[in-house]
Amino acid sequence: MIDLIVLGAAAGGGFPQWNSNAPACRRARADDPAAPSRTQASIAVSGDGAHWFVVNASPDLRAQIGQTPALHPRHGLRSTPIAGVILTGGEVDTVTGLLTLRERQPFTLLATPPVLDLLDANPIFEALDRSIVPRVPLALDQPFALALPDGTPAGLTITPFAVPGKVPLYAESGPDPAAIVENGETIGLAMTDGVRHAYFIPGCARMTGPLRARLRGADLVFFDGTLWTDDEMLRAGVGQKTGQRMGHMSVSGDGGTIDAFADLDVRRKVLIHINNSNPLLLADSPERQVAHQAGWEVSFDGMRITT
């Protein structure tokens, strides 16, 4: 069994974003049923429905745990069903929530070496006592059997793999700070119980041949849904960057996500990490209908999928 809960479906800033007065965010603040609020992207995954691994620790993690009964303490005065946290990158939106988990509660922190190096370089993350929260490096393309803090097998195996992306904004440097790289700075995560296969790829700058081959025939894929069009933030007057500058491919258009997945025979396709400028967030938008007609679902906080 692969049991997944969407803790947060939106991109950085959430929906509505705290400083956005754009029409969609105003609709969300007004509790428009077609524009429900969403917190910042994160999922929880379990092999038994009892012990969970959080994938990406968003700034909203405390609220996300509170809204998710499966992650509530169950035993004694202090406990947690969260056995570990897995990071797919070192962006502010994926690591900040780690500080919420600093209450001397054992769990395992897993990430690729470049991401662990970013954490090591910032002493604030030493608030997570390494004797209680060990940091475990993940090697690209090497299966890793998840285990509970006591060593008991968790029933899931993950395989991290590089996808095209960029370094976090705060780590940009050099002559081409926005260069798209495929070196482990940004990863996707394959998850399997030995029978079913699911993938979590919240950030991806472009589709590649090897990535197409990897995803073909998958049972479930959560994929980067940041922007509907590459220049939507520029056209809306709410930002100065394109999707490519931020390391995200667009959902629509030639070479976009819908186009790239058209012949991959993925059983269930779900968009996640959706920016507040993306009309996909609006249930009554034409763009939402286009995505649905192409076989895509739009994730929402609390969405639960069991394969």
From Swiss-Prot:
InterPro entries, sorted: Metallo-B-lactamas, PQQ_synth_PqqB, RibonucZ/Hydroxyglut_hydro
Source domain of life: Bacteria
Keyword Transport tagged: yes
GO biological process: pyrroloquinoline quinone biosynthetic process
Database matches in CDD domains: PQQB-like_MBL-fold (cd16274)
Record keywords, A-Z: PQQ biosynthesis, Transport
Cited Pfam families: Lactamase_B_2 (PF12706)
Listed pathway(s): Cofactor biosynthesis; pyrroloquinoline quinone biosynthesis
Keyword Transport applies: yes
Family matches, as PANTHER family: COENZYME PQQ SYNTHESIS PROTEIN B (PTHR42663:SF7), HYDROLASE C777.06C-RELATED-RELATED (PTHR42663)
HAMAP family: PQQ_syn_PqqB (MF_00653)
Family: Belongs to the PqqB family.
Function comment: May be involved in the transport of PQQ or its precursor to the periplasm.
Name of the molecule in the record: Coenzyme PQQ synthesis protein B
Species, as recorded: Gluconacetobacter diazotrophicus (strain ATCC 49037 / DSM 5601 / CCUG 37298 / CIP 103539 / LMG 7603 / PAl5)
Gene responsible for this protein: pqqB
